[in-house]
């Protein structure tokens, strides 16, 4: 990043620095529970502290903006992105979203630009199908799905990201009424609006733009400042200004907002601020992740008072994750599995008497089919010794595969 930034600024006539962005969703090098888990802590101060640590680690890598937090009210477990949200309650999403923005943008020398997403209604897609339309009443939309944004905007996030979906058959990335009328005029947002991945180009696929050129016009007029990963702005914006189809002042407004974001991050004074700074995956950071994990746990029942487990009693730990390092979950692109301690390693380190059995991983065993495992377990055990060991002990902790 240092080399790219240096070469770019040398070649740029006005020496305007680049801003590097990435998905830092629930930690950077130190990984915390997913946002849905963090919501279970009901501890916004800890959420803010975790975001501040993530900002420090991200800025040390040269990243100065994240596409987080996601505060879509999510009530359909079929929706694949529900793990990024703080759950089903608008108030919890608003409180936790604001706390996360505060954490990301808190410290002058290591802060990163926060991005509220996805504006708006993305969590209400029909049948939980990603990219689907949203059909809800205006009252429900404003009171339930816009409310978290209204709350989190008080923290003054640098960016807001548009949603993929359409409201009343109008895709958000080209929806002037929502982006200018509601977000900017009514809610007072003055920062940068960025599209989601390719969502401007998808205006053509959604049937509201005849071609990519018209998609660029609609998005620009709606107030989208940054076109993420579609060719619409890059290919057509300059031509549209020259032909008079888009006012030059409209492009100037968007450019000004992006420049202001860079200025607020201090990139003009020091485009390398935080780069190479130490503090990644420190013991302090690990302890905060451990604290968050503990506070995120939800005890559903403890009828026979099995918990807490006694360290004096032998316990069987059974399942594929007993010896696995894959505990970082999704959207943890900067986490390293090599840094994770397995359950088996931790038990040995703490000298706790336990036996770990991995068993069969039905999700990644290339030679295994679910119906075969079911048949073998009912007729002839796949591993008789494994089953015998489990049934011999009074206490078994199941550590199954988590699939998202």
Q: Model segments located where?
A:
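Glycoside hydrolase catalytic-domain context in secreted enzymes
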Residues: 1-403
């Amino acid at each position: 990043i240092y080399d790219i930034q240096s070469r770019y600024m040398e070649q740029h006539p006005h020496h305007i620095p680049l801003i590097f962005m990435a998905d830092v969703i629930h930690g950077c090098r130190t990984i915390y529970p997913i946002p849905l888990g963090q919501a279970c802590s009901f501890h916004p101060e800890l959420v803010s502290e975790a975001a501040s640590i993530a900002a420090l680690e991200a800025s040390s890598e040269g990243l100065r903006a994240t596409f987080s937090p996601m505060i879509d009210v999510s009530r359909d477990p079929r929706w694949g992105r529900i793990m990024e949200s703080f759950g089903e309650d608008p108030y919890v999403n608003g409180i936790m979203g604001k706390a996360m923005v505060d954490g990301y943008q808190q410290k002058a020398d290591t802060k990163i630009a926060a991005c509220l997403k996805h504006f708006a209604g993305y969590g209400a897609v029909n049948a939980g199908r990603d990219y689907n339309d949203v059909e809800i009443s205006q009252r429900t939309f404003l009171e339930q799905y816009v409310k978290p944004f209204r709350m989190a905007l008080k923290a003054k996030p640098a960016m807001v990201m548009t949603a993929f979906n359409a409201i009343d058959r109008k895709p958000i990335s080209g929806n002037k009424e929502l982006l200018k009328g509601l977000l900017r005029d009514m809610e007072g947002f003055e920062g940068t609006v960025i599209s989601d991945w390719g969502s401007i180009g998808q205006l053509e696929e959604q049937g509201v733009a005849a071609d990519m050129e018209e998609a660029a016009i609609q998005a620009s007029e709606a107030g989208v400042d940054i076109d993420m990963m579609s060719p619409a702005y890059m290919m057509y914006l300059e031509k549209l200004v020259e032909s008079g189809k888009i006012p030059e002042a409209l492009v100037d407004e968007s450019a000004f907002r992006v420049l202001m974001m860079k200025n607020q991050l201090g990139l003009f004074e020091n485009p390398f601020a935080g780069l190479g700074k130490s503090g990644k995956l420190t013991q302090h950071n690990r302890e905060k992740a451990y604290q968050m994990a503990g506070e995120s746990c939800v005890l559903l029942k403890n009828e026979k008072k099995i918990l807490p487990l006694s360290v004096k009693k032998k316990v069987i730990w059974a399942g594929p994750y007993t010896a696995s390092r894959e505990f970082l979950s999704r959207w943890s692109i900067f986490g390293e599995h090599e840094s994770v301690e397995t359950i088996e390693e931790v038990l040995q380190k703490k000298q706790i008497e336990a036996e770990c059995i991995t068993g069969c991983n039905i999700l990644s065993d290339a030679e295994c089919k679910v119906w075969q495992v079911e048949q073998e377990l009912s007729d002839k055990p796949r591993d008789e010794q494994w089953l015998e060991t489990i049934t011999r002990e009074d206490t078994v902790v199941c550590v199954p595969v988590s699939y998202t």
